[in-house]
């Protein structure tokens, strides 16, 4: 395999030498084997500048496939008769190579030789270079000639610069005074020279702008590998539209982008994020209500818990403070009753901000003594109540527990179950569990029971019970509870008399309990969603397929028709084209029963008497024909 890096571009081997026939015989004498064990190491840009080595003159063999054990170095002889400016013959370690016989310019006493492992580079003295260049900045002023080069791998920046420079050789034409007038390009192929005159600055700009396409591809491949190994240092592409939507919902971007003043945040009613869906502008400027509400707010990470002070009935008694509530025996008998009461009773500091009662100190002291002696509370609770200073006890009112409230084991909700959590209970209305409304709830609020026996006064169910009731779900004003006597009468008559107490349940429409989650499009039928023409075409196509299969006609999976059947089918098609509107639909049933017809004439593209109906809808007129129209 001939290595194109070793091309030799010689303009005039000897002064006055013009015999080109003998020059063409030179390549046969220059083929010699190369030992790869003594190949040089990679030469980079810094080392190349130190050694003053020439660059490669071809870009397609920078990554050459050195598969052969022996390699022959060839060269090419240029046809230009003009002497190249800077000629630097090379020498090998194994002398002689018969290259010195071409030129004797290296015999200068001041020339120096530099060995790179394979070749010896002999450079002429600097006076020779300065005299030849004559102040013109050229590539050949600081680099060697393209005589015989070893395979090298250069850095990428050098490859960019040299890829275009190696395409051509620049040789000046000098006038009598020794100054160059114009420059000629002599290519490898030896084409005719095209002369043009440019300045050195324009030449440098052209050389920097023109980059070889092959090196651009290699650079793209290298950059792709660079990015794959360093993904963590590269920022991902972010779609600004999607990011702005997400930031708006998360509350990071205001809905009014023109508002940039953040000094008056309390006065700004402009909401951000999900607050737009829960707009309560009346409470925006009320800072006290926000502080009170922030204590009970929950985030996405924590689950909402039932506060302890909600277990108490906070409605003050209408009678005198001396009356004591009737607490169930289950509270005192249960082992956890003391701990539950201690945690459930609110502290005076919590209640002082909400309640402001201005009474005498004597009445407050007597109220504390009465609650200590007669309620049956533990001594620790009494001490905790009396241990507060007088200034804090002033704003504290007495609260009484609900006698029907069982803290240890709460009742199940009306329409669901309690989901047991490690810290609290959650009521779930699942529609599967239900409890008797009469025995559980309505026995406690019979007529006259609250006013006669209890010392409270009339109270509703929501005030006396903490579990959710029907009033929390829907309006139960028309739902009248039935008493125990009514139930006993119904059982004795064996349900002869119909109970109309729960007749309201029959009138509850579907979707009452999931009104906000109800999608209207789910209740529509597919025929209403689709277009009328689309639905009609589907029904007609299904009907036609059913009739074709019933009559035993040929289908696509059957054996192909014979020539006789094909001729008959073509005749039927021609006949169908000539048929009038009335004839075609009157003979439609007989045409389907014909054994030679497969109904293919319906697939032809023709309109039926200007009605705009396609062939698929033509079987619809069979109904009109059978009904007598």
Curated annotation (Swiss-Prot):
Sorted UniProt keywords: Phosphoprotein
Cellular component, GO, one term: nucleus
Entry keyword annotation includes Phosphoprotein: yes
One Pfam family hit: CRF1
GO molecular function: transcription coactivator activity; transcription coregulator activity
Ranges annotated as biased composition (Polar residues): 448-463
Location of Phosphoserine modifications: 334
Record's protein name: Uncharacterized protein C22H10.11c
Keyword Phosphoprotein annotated: yes
Comp. bias regions, Acidic residues: 200-209
GO terms under biological process: positive regulation of ribosomal protein gene transcription by RNA polymerase II; positive regulation of ribosome biogenesis; regulation of transcription by RNA polymerase II
Region (Disordered): 101-126, 172-209, 315-339, 448-468
Signal peptide: none
């Amino acid at each position: 395999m001939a290595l194109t890096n070793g091309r030799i571009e010689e303009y005039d081997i000897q002064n006055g030498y013009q015999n080109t026939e003998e020059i063409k015989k030179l390549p046969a004498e220059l083929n010699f084997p190369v030992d790869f064990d003594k190949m040089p190491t990679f030469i980079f840009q810094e080392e190349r500048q130190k050694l003053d080595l020439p660059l490669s003159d071809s870009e397609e063999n920078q990554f050459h496939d050195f598969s052969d054990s022996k390699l022959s170095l060839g060269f090419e002889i240029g046809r230009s008769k003009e002497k190249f400016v800077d000629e630097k013959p090379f020498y090998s370690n194994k002398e002689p190579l018969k290259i010195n016989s071409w030129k004797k310019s290296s015999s200068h006493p001041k020339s120096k030789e530099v060995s790179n492992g394979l070749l010896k580079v002999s450079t002429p003295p600097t006076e020779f270079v300065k005299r030849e260049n004559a102040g013109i900045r050229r590539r050949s002023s600081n680099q060697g000639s393209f005589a015989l080069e070893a395979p090298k791998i250069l850095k990428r920046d050098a490859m960019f610069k040299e890829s275009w420079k190696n395409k051509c050789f620049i040789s000046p034409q000098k006038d009598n005074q020794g100054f160059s007038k114009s420059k000629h390009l002599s290519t490898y192929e030896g084409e005719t020279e095209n002369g043009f005159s440019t300045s050195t600055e324009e030449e440098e700009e052209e050389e920097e702008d023109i980059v070889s396409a092959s090196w651009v591809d290699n650079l793209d491949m290298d950059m792709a590998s660079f990015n794959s190994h360093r993904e963590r240092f590269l920022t991902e592409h972010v779609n600004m539209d999607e990011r702005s939507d997400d930031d708006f919902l998360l509350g990071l971007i205001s809905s009014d982008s023109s508002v940039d003043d953040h000094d008056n945040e309390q006065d700004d009613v402009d909401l951000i994020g999900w607050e737009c869906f829960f707009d309560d502008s009346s409470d925006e400027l009320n800072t006290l209500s926000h502080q009170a509400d922030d204590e009970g707010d929950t985030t996405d990470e924590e689950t909402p818990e039932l506060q302890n002070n909600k277990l108490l009935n906070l409605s003050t008694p209408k009678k005198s403070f001396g009356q004591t509530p009737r607490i169930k025996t289950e509270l005192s008998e249960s082992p956890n009753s003391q701990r539950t009461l201690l945690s459930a009773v609110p502290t005076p500091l919590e209640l002082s901000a909400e309640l402001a009662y201005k009474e005498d100190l004597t009445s407050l002291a007597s109220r504390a003594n009465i609650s200590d002696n007669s309620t049956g509370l533990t001594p620790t609770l009494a001490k905790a109540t009396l241990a507060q200073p007088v200034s804090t006890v002033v704003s504290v009112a007495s609260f009484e527990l609900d006698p029907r409230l069982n803290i240890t084991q709460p009742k199940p909700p009306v329409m669901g179950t309690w989901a047991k959590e490690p810290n609290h209970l959650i009521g779930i209305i699942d529609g599967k569990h239900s409890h008797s409304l009469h025995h559980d709830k309505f026995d406690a609020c019979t007529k006259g029971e609250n006013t006669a026996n209890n010392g409270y006064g009339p109270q509703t169910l929501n005030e006396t019970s903490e579990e959710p009731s029907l009033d929390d779900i829907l309006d139960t004003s028309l739902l009248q509870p039935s008493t125990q006597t009514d139930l006993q009468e119904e059982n004795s008559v064996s349900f002869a008399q119909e109970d109309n107490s729960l007749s309201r349940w029959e009138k509850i429409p579907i979707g009452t309990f999931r009104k906000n989650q109800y999608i209207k499009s789910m209740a529509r039928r597919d025929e209403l969603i689709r277009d009328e023409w689309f639905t009609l075409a589907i029904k007609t196509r299904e009907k036609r397929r059913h009739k074709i299969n019933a009559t035993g006609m040929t289908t696509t999976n059957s054996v192909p028709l014979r020539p006789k059947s094909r001729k008959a089918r073509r005749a039927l098609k021609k006949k169908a084209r000539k048929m009038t509107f009335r004839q075609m639909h009157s003979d439609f049933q007989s045409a389907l029963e014909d054994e030679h017809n497969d109904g293919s004439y319906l697939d032809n593209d023709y309109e039926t008497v200007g009605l705009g109906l396609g062939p698929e809808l033509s079987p619809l007129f069979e109904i009109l024909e059978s009904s007598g129209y």
